[in-house]
């Protein structure tokens, strides 16, 4: 990013935004040049992407972790596969979407889950607003965990709305290996949130890493 000569103000290490200049705006996103003060008192600029749809809610959208529970079956994580033009190919993701004006994150999560997968569930927990790619955008989401009763009649044959997505259910206890297999077979990309979740499951169930003894 561009930088300018240091100013005489703000030499105490505090960083803050000075100004934001609109460069280009489309229907869904806009590009801005953000001018800010770095810890040394130098004025710098940063190119930032922001959504045009943000309202008064605390986050732009929701990402749903749907846990499908059925009697005598392993728990499964319900994912969606869809074509993403910016990636130029297919991606595996959590069901997700923007929060409508006046809608709670929990309500948005249940709505998006049903629209994309056809499943109906119950909210187990909802995270605070968390950032997604802070080096590029100010976009934030609530991560909402939803449990799905697979024994319920309404979830026996879920009917998602036609959104050009494929619903994939993978065993929770083998999620990372199944994702790696799909990547190798279909040459798609896994969303970082999904892969991080799979890695966390693996690490949580694995033996602690051995720390080698130091030799003196």
From Swiss-Prot:
Q: Name one GO biological process term.
A: D-ribose catabolic process
User: What is this protein called in UniProt?
Assistant: ADP-sugar pyrophosphatase
Q: Which PANTHER family match?
A: ADP-SUGAR PYROPHOSPHATASE, UDP/ADP-SUGAR PYROPHOSPHATASE
Q: Mainly resides where? A: nucleus
Q: Which residues form a coiled coil?
A: none
> Sites of the modification N-acetylmethionine?
1
EC number(s) given by UniProt: 3.6.1.13, 3.6.1.58, 2.7.7.96
What does the function comment of this entry state? Enzyme that can either act as an ADP-sugar pyrophosphatase in absence of diphosphate or catalyze the synthesis of ATP in presence of diphosphate. In absence of diphosphate, hydrolyzes with similar activities various modified nucleoside diphosphates such as ADP-ribose, ADP-mannose, ADP-glucose, 8-oxo-GDP and 8-oxo-dGDP. Can also hydrolyze other nucleotide sugars with low activity. In presence of diphosphate, mediates the synthesis of ATP in the nucleus by catalyzing the conversion of ADP-ribose to ATP and ribose 5-phosphate. Nuclear ATP synthesis takes place when dephosphorylated at Thr-45.
Q: How does it assemble?
A: Homodimer. Interacts with PARG.
**Any GO molecular function:** snoRNA binding
Q: Which residues carry this modification: N6-acetyllysine?
A: 207, 215
Positions with a binding annotation for Mg(2+) 2 = 112
Cell location? Nucleus
Site of covalent link Glycyl lysine isopeptide (Lys-Gly) (interchain with G-Cter in SUMO2): 42
- Record keywords: Acetylation, Hydrolase, Isopeptide bond, Magnesium, Metal-binding, Nucleus, Phosphoprotein, RNA-binding, Transferase, Ubl conjugation
**Post-translational modification remark:** Phosphorylation at Thr-45 is required for homodimer stability; dephosphorylation results in destabilization of the homodimer. Dephosphorylation at Thr-45 promotes the ATP-synthesis activity.
Tell me what organism the protein belongs to: Pongo abelii (Sumatran orangutan)
The record's similarity note reads: Belongs to the Nudix hydrolase family.
């Amino acid at each position: 990013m561009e930088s300018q000569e240091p100013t005489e103000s703000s030499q105490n290490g505090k960083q803050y935004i000075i100004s934001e200049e609109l460069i280009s705006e489309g229907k869904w996103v806009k590009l801005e040049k953000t001018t800010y003060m770095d810890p040394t008192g130098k004025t710098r600029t940063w190119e930032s992407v922001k959504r045009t749809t943000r309202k008064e809610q605390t986050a732009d959208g929701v990402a749903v972790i749907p846990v499908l529970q059925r009697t005598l079956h392993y728990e499964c994580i319900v994912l969606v596969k869809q074509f993403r033009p910016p990636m130029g190919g297919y991606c595996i993701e959590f069901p997700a979407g923007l929060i409508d004006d006046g809608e709670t994150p929990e309500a948005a999560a249940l709505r998006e889950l049903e629209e994309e997968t056809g499943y109906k569930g119950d909210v187990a927990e909802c995270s605070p607003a968390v950032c997604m790619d802070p080096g590029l955008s100010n976009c934030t989401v609530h991560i909402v965990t939803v449990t799905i009763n697979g024994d319920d009649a309404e979830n026996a044959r879920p009917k998602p709305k036609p959104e050009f997505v494929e619903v994939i259910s993978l065993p929770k206890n083998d999620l990372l290996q199944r994702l790696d297999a799909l990547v190798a077979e279909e040459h798609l990309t896994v969303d970082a949130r999904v892969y991080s979740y799979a890695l966390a499951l693996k690490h949580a169930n694995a033996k602690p890493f051995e720390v080698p003894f130091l030799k003196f």
